[in-house]
Regions:
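Bacterial Sec-dependent N-terminal signal peptides
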Residues: 1-60
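Structural detector for internal amphipathic alpha-helices that build alpha-solenoid repeat scaffolds
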Residues: 591-593, 618-630, 641, 651-664, ...
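Non-catalytic accessory/interaction domains
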Residues: 231, 246, 374, 482-671, ...
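Short coil turns that connect the paired helices of HEAT/ARM alpha-solenoid repeats
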Residues: 610-613, 643-649, 678-684, 710-716, ...
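Hydrophobic alpha-helical and helix-loop surface patches within well-folded domains
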Residues: 38, 54-56, 69, 117, ...
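Amphipathic alpha-helical scaffolding segments comprising HEAT/armadillo-like alpha-solenoid repeats
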Residues: 598-607, 631-643, 663-677, 698-710, ...
Length: 872
């Protein structure tokens, strides 16, 4: 699953997607996973300005979370369910086939959340039924069934359950307006909201599918399945496996039957229902379909069209052909995570739906698409036996994003992703967490940057250490020997050892079953005929690992392979013909490590110029040179040179790094910026150059350049032009602002300031989805993106003064997701978050006082619930 914070991508660089497989956070706020980063400096400033007290975080290891005991094993699950949109419930019939795991048993315990149980019977071989005694504890969410006799491990039995499930809460009990653990979610079920489609969809991971059918809701269970799904006739359905029949009913409904004959874990069950356009594709004769809102039908293949190529790539790379009968992907509204790898029926958040102009710039969801597909080997075919071992699923899926980029676009672009992921991991409060850990407080804690990012790039280290042939042969062995079964990290180790003949306990013990990573101070001594590299490990525990050290002489590189021992200080000496030009530690950038090293500016210049095939080294050099551009001519000239780098990522970084408020920088960079803004092959680079030119151009010298940019297909280029013209030539936008796509408008804070009052007057609440997050975080904008401060405040005032449940729920979800991140990583900021939520509540209460009605009362309850959730 990809956990991601659904933020504004390029608009707010401190608030961005992680893709994070994310299924990153992939499951809350990888994607990308993708995850929320807020720099400590920002929060320190907020806390000082608000006088907030900072609390220390207590940690302890007094919890043990074992794999769930297997008493009974699922064999087959058959469901006959009817969705009731009016009261948001399910009428269900279920036939479960099971057998004892080992010990004889006369009872069965199932997970069942928020249900009314009507009857339970044993189904005999002839189809007759015998009532069974049962006890349902609604508070414990357990259904305990007394079987008719004691069964042994070679005996199967089938039970029938008739039930009604209430994902929103059993009538008479508290409802969960924005809870993430319902299992089944009804979106705009009565169709009251004109701009939100009516849908129903499920999210099972970690253990939530027991919210819509009774099951043993544990990842170490595997079952085949059949689902008969009755829905309004005008809706499309999707579930796991093959659609075997569609029957129109006399009452205006239709029953679709889906069957999957290969077993998988209960959390991977999925149903999706709604008004979707279905765009058909195929791979080796198997259906590959894309379910999107009708508005996005024309771009569905732009978004998802690389899926067949990915299927071929991963099948070949993993040495195991894609095993399932189809591969469908559905984009759903108000998804509680980034994406989810439901077997053959992947669900994506609406962020996946992009306009053509956005896709011209970059398909921001491509990493997620690769991530979820890779899960069909790691997670669906072979499933981690417990959430303590979740990285067996998520580490591989996360690393598969890198593998896809490397294959399709080259190593530089893959290394950009690695740099982002590791920066994300290093920035969080992650050092003291074991990768495989049995002491998590809540299962949701496992869906973090350790499981995803660290787990993925530990695999990258293992690949580098063993070599490609051995690494991928080991993966093939692992998949073939554990197909349709559960597995844990120790079995992964054994697979690698079986193939390579190497003992890998040293690797797995420190990287999988231990915590942290090396933190190393580097001091390099350049001598006439020798270089001496001193590496001091400053962390505990100490690590051992192979390392490359590159020594450059006369423009040529010599790569040395050394072994860093578990010692505080490791010193390595290398002979040279004269004085070396440059030494780069970890030249191939394959270790999960934080280096602390300071070099003179001229050495960073050399690092950029000499490390032509190692993007991370060039990127590090650019970041260091940016700090010195105002005091070093060489630093500035190298930044300008980097604006022509073969890597678009480096070009964009170099442009972003320019301080064009300085007259010398302006003078030297202006001509190059103008050329790049006009003709760079990558629109995101052009857009960045336009933004810098906009800061320089006080006399409208480049007005025509910006007017021409307004004609671009690219949303990034067009957005940069709009922002410039809204300040310098607003008349150029007179004919544009009427039909301006909201996704373009949010690129321009100045234009938003003009348009939001107009939209408010015209009651264009259909724009709320693009404004909700900006509005929710209005109080942060003066600190992280000052130019959006006024527009975000205007959006906040408008949305919270409007009777709109969907937007209120969305804003509450923003606060909830931020809180989940902050309590682990930035506890000092929680009071500030609560203050924003309280302000939202106060404004909604004022609206209710003016226009009292049940909908506004419900919105107040939604905000009160999230405020109660936010604790110090």
């Amino acid at each position: 699953m990809l956990v991601c914070f659904l933020f504004f991508y390029d608009k707010f660089p401190l608030l961005f997607l992680i893709i994070f497989h994310t299924k990153s956070l992939r499951k809350d706020f990888k994607f990308r996973y993708i995850c929320f980063l807020m720099k400590k400096a920002v929060f320190s400033l907020l806390c000082i300005s608000l006088g907030l007290h900072v609390h220390a975080q207590n940690t302890g290891k007094d919890i043990y979370r074992p794999e769930q005991e297997q008493i009974n094993n699922l064999i087959d699950t058959k469901l006959d369910i009817k969705l009731n949109f009016d009261n948001q419930s399910i009428d269900g019939k279920e036939w479960l086939t099971l057998k004892p795991h080992f010990y004889p048993t006369d009872s069965l315990t199932l997970d069942a959340k928020n249900m009314l149980i009507h009857q339970i019977s044993l189904v005999n071989n002839n189809g007759n039924t015998t009532p069974l005694q049962y006890d349902y504890d609604l508070n414990q969410q357990k259904l305990k069934i007394k079987l008719n006799k004691t069964y042994t491990r070679d005996q199967t039995y089938k039970i029938f359950i008739q039930y009604t499930a209430y994902p929103e809460g059993v009538p008479g009990r508290d409802k969960k307006y924005y809870s993430k653990d319902k299992g089944l979610y009804f979106i705009n079920p009565q169709g009251k909201n004109s701009y939100i489609p009516t849908q129903a969809w499920t999210q099972g991971e970690p253990m939530d599918n027991s919210g819509w059918f009774p099951t043993i809701d544990s990842p170490n269970q595997k079952t085949t399945q059949e689902i008969s799904l009755t829905v309004p006739k005008n809706f499309v359905t999707l579930s796991n496996g093959t659609l075997t029949s569609k029957i129109d009913n006399a009452n205006g409904t239709r029953t679709d039957n889906w069957r999957q004959t290969q077993k998988h874990a209960p959390y991977l069950f999925f149903i999706g229902v709604g008004d979707f356009a279905v765009v058909e594709d195929q791979w080796k004769g198997r259906p590959v379909n894309y379910y999107v809102e009708p508005e996005y039908k024309s771009v569905a293949k732009e978004i998802f069209g690389k899926t067949p190529e990915m299927l071929t790539f991963f099948s070949e790379k993993f040495g195991y052909e894609y095993p399932w009968d189809k591969y469908s992907q559905m984009v759903v509204r108000d998804f509680v995570t980034g994406a989810m790898e439901n077997t053959t029926a992947v669900s994506h958040s609406q962020t996946a739906q992009q306009k053509h102009g956005e896709l011209v710039d970059k398909n921001v969801w491509e990493d997620v698409i690769a991530h979820e597909l890779a899960h069909h080997w790691f997670g669906d075919l072979v499933t981690s036996e417990s959430f303590a071992n979740l990285t067996v699923n998520e580490g591989f899926a996360n690393y598969s994003e890198y593998l896809w980029r490397e294959h399709k676009y080259g190593k530089d672009y893959a290394d950009e992703l690695r740099e982002e992921d590791l920066e994300d991991y290093f920035s969080g409060n992650n050092f003291h967490k074991d990768l495989v850990r049995f002491d998590y407080k809540k299962v949701g804690d496992m869906f973090d940057r350790v499981t995803y990012n660290k787990g993925g790039y530990i695999l990258h280290m293992l690949r580098s250490y063993l070599g490609d042939d051995a690494f991928f042969e080991s993966i093939k062995y692992f998949l073939n020997h554990h197909e349709y079964q559960k597995a844990e990290a120790q079995q992964l180790r054994l697979a690698f050892e079986h193939v390579t003949g190497k003992d890998l306990n040293w690797f797995f013990n420190q990287w999988f079953f231990g915590h942290g990573h090396p933190k190393i101070n580097v001091v390099t001594e350049y001598k006439p005929n020798e270089v001496v590299v001193n590496l001091k490990q400053t962390q505990s525990p100490l690590f051992e690992f192979p390392l490359t050290i590159d020594v450059y002489e006369n423009g040529k590189r010599t790569r040395h392979k050394v072994w860093v021992k578990k010692e505080p200080l490791n010193t390595f000496k290398f002979s040279t013909q004269g004085k070396a030009q440059l030494v780069v530690v970890d030249g191939i950038n394959d270790i999960v490590v934080e280096f602390n090293e300071e070099k003179p500016v001229d050495l960073y210049v050399q690092q950029y110029l000499l490390c032509k095939d190692e993007l991370p080294s060039r990127m590090q050099a650019i970041k260091k040179l940016a700090y010195n551009q105002l005091i070093s001519k060489n630093a500035l000239s190298t930044l300008i040179t980097a604006m022509k780098d073969p890597s678009a990522g480096i070009r964009k970084l170099a442009i972003e790094s320019l301080d064009v408020t300085d007259s010398v920088v302006q003078e030297q960079a202006e001509e190059a910026l103008a050329k790049i803004a006009e003709s760079d092959p990558k629109t995101l680079v052009r857009a960045e150059a336009l933004k810098k030119l906009a800061q320089i151009d006080k006399d409208k010298k480049y007005l025509n350049l910006f007017k021409n940019a307004l004609k671009s297909e690219s949303f990034a280029v067009k957005g940069a032009a709009i922002d410039y013209l809204s300040q310098n030539a607003p008349e150029e936008l007179d004919n544009l602002s009427e039909d301006l796509d909201i996704k373009l408008a949010v690129n321009s804070p100045r234009l938003l300031e003009k348009l939001i009052p107009q939209w408010r007057q015209e009651n264009k609440i259909n724009y709320f989805p693009e404004l909700n997050e900006m509005a929710a975080l209005y109080a942060l904008m003066p600190y992280i993106k000052p130019e959006y401060a006024k527009a975000s405040q205007m959006a906040f005032d408008w949305i919270l003064s409007t009777n709109d449940l969907a937007s209120t729920q969305a804003i509450a979800k923003v606060y909830s997701n931020y809180y989940k991140f902050m309590k682990e990583n930035q506890k000092e900021a929680i009071p500030f978050l609560r203050a924003m939520a309280n302000n939202a509540l106060e404004l909604k209460q004022k609206t209710y006082q003016q226009y009292p009605n049940d909908d506004l009362k419900k919105q107040i309850e939604v905000l009160e619930e999230v405020i109660n959730e936010i604790k110090d």
